[in-house]
Amino acid sequence: TYDSAYIIAEDKYGSYGICGFYVLNKTCKTLEHFLFSCRIMNMGIEDFVFSYLEKPHINIVLPVSSFLGGTSNWIKLVDNLDLKPIEVKKQASINILFKGACDLYSVINYISGDCNIDTEFPYWNKQLIYILSHTHTAFIEQTHRLPYNKLMELTKSFPFPHPDEFKTKFFSKKYDAIILSLLTTTYRGLYINKNDRTYVEYGYANCDITDENNWDKVLSSIPEKYKEENRLLLKVFKEEYKFAGDPPVELVLKNLEYIRKNLADKTELILILGSEIPTQKALEGYEDMAKKHITLNKHVREFVKNYNNITTLELTDLIQSDDDYNECINHFSRRVYNAFAQKIIHIVNSKLGKAYLQLKEL
């Protein structure tokens, strides 16, 4: 027999919705599925659920974002916590878009005020394909620049990108501020078509899939019977695409120039720059990220000097110790997300000339 459930969480800052699920085989007391969203990192919810289930056997498949074993005695189980209905947005004075990794949800949960907030984060689509590439500056740029038919052509030769990567409201004239994180742009692998200069994105920037020396690593997670056909696909990909760089500094600056030129003049563009303080906490693909952040950030700062409607937010300034990192250089403690939100509030209010945003009251 099986016990299965999904988990809903909320705290004094807001509701996190469905943030995890499990499937417990009660006969052999084994967790067959146990998965949680990065929205609730550092809250101890996975530890609490694991303890509540009396710590059954679990086969942990690495890499993971956290390890089980904490106490989480600050969490309370209730039987009346329901999914909140989606509220119809009220007319607000300003409109804001957050675009980047999904842990930005942790920032938004601290923000309130006279605003409507839209988000464009990675997500699993209906075909259970992870839609992530759209957060890269190159995808933002080409989605606006290229006609729809050309974008759809990009989806036909290889398993990536999926058509959903090109769905966006980024260039809508309604936004008064756009918060764009450059963290995914820094660590994701970008490739340029040798003929028409279009872009596709795949994997991590530290593993160039046009380099045959990396193919065994790229194919390591694929069942043996499918490896040869995928190796042939990589050969075709190598003939058609070249690696953009790690990080692709000149290309990112070109993307940002296009983005700023094609946004409404009133839209304040706030760029999130990754932390330059090293940490020993590193998931696969995130190695040496501090050095990469230093390289890209230096050029972005110079680029921004030419504009009065672009602001940078330096995550480096928010880090006080290694405890502020959770699992890697791009995920943070609750204290950092709170400080992150305060920085956003200050920048938006200062640039728009009025205190539209505020920190949520406890």
Residue ranges and their predicted role:
Residues 93-140, 178, 183-184:
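Catalytic nucleophile-elbow at a beta strand-turn-alpha helix junction centered on a G-D-S/GDSL motif
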Residues 100-101, 175-196, 270-277, 314-318:
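Short loop/turn segments at strand-loop or loop-helix junctions that form parts
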Residues 324-362:
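Histidine-centered active-site loop/cap adjacent to the catalytic His
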Residues 51, 159-164, 242-259, 286-301, ...:
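Well-ordered, non-membrane alpha-helical segments in soluble/globular domains
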Residues 149-155, 190, 203-254, 281-289, ...:
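Surface-exposed cleft-lining segments at the edges of enzyme active sites
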